[in-house]
Structures are given as structure tokens and as C-alpha cells.
Amino acid sequence: MGKILVWDVPTRIGHWLLVITFTLSFITGDSEEQRLFHVAAGYAVGGILVFRIFWGIAGTRYARFVSFLFTPSEVIGYLGALVKGKPGHWLGHNPAGSYAIYILILLGIATVVSGVAAYVEIGGDWMAEVHDVLSYTMLGMVVIHILGVIVSGWAHHENLVLSMFNGYKQGKSKEAIEPSKKYWIVVPIASAILASLLVYIT
């Protein structure tokens, strides 16, 4: 057992860009003066989510959706074992974490779509209310995700936040991924920037 690469560069950059852009979009949501900034951040969130879906299909081993497809019974079993202090260990996303990711992606897409609709005045006040509800629901899911990371990290004696920065976790060498091509670094960044620029041409 030793330190092995689990999270590739695009996954890590995409993750932290999503953290930043969602935070910016949320804290500027109620400010009329910062409305354009809010919309730009929202477009960036959308662009990053599009990239994440793509990377979930074409990315490296632990970034792919097929590596964290779990049944509800597996999630319940994992949570039960976690409560007993004997949770199973996954190098990639664990069963509970995988569901949080899927929910966050779906909520994120719904929030962005409703936000765009409200911005172009489709649906009127009703759509704006839907957007607000989805935004706060996503915030709640983010909080649950963070708590899950803390509990899982404590249970497995891992620094999961650090691993999402440097990409490394404890594991066997045969379980490591190959470093992704450096040019992939520009993909999540370009997605965020290009999506943000859309606000100025629509």
C-alpha cells in the first residue's frame, strides 16, 4: 500500500471550479446590482457540469460514471456499516457519495436551466421562484455532501479534501490511474469561460 493517483487533473480542476462558481452564483443571487455577474457565474456552472458529464463518460477510471454505479441497497448497506464503524472502502466514490454526485449534477442542471429561463423572462415570477427553490435545495445537498466527506474521511482515516487537491489516496499500485494528458487541463477551464461569455451575447 502506498500513495497512488486516483483523481486526474481535469476532475480536480472541474470540482474546484464548480465549488467557486456555485458559491459566487449563490451569494450574488439576491443582488440586482450584481445580476450580470450572477448570470455569468451560473453559465459557468452549466459549462462545468456539461464537462463533468462528458468526463464521466470519457474520463479516467474513477471519474467515469460506470465506476460508481450502485444500487439503493448498496447505499443502505454502506450507511449501515458506516454507523457501525465498519464501512467498506472504495478508492473512488463510495455508494453514498455517488448518489450525492448524481443528485448534485441533476440539481445543478435544473438550477441552471431554470435560471436561464427566468433571465430571459420565460415563466415569469413562477420560474424565478422555481430557480430559488432549486438553488437552496442544491445548497442543502452541498452541505450534506460536505458532511459526508467529513464523516467518510474520519471513518477511513483519510484526508479526502487533500486528495481532491493533489489527486492521491492510499492504495495498491495496480489500482492507480495513469496521469491524464496535460492538454485536458484546458477543458474545464475553457468550458467555464466560454459558458460565462454567453451571457454577453444573448
Question: What are the functions of these language-model segments?
Answer:
Residues 1-202:
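Membrane-embedded alpha-helical bundles that constitute the cytochrome b-like, heme-associated redox core
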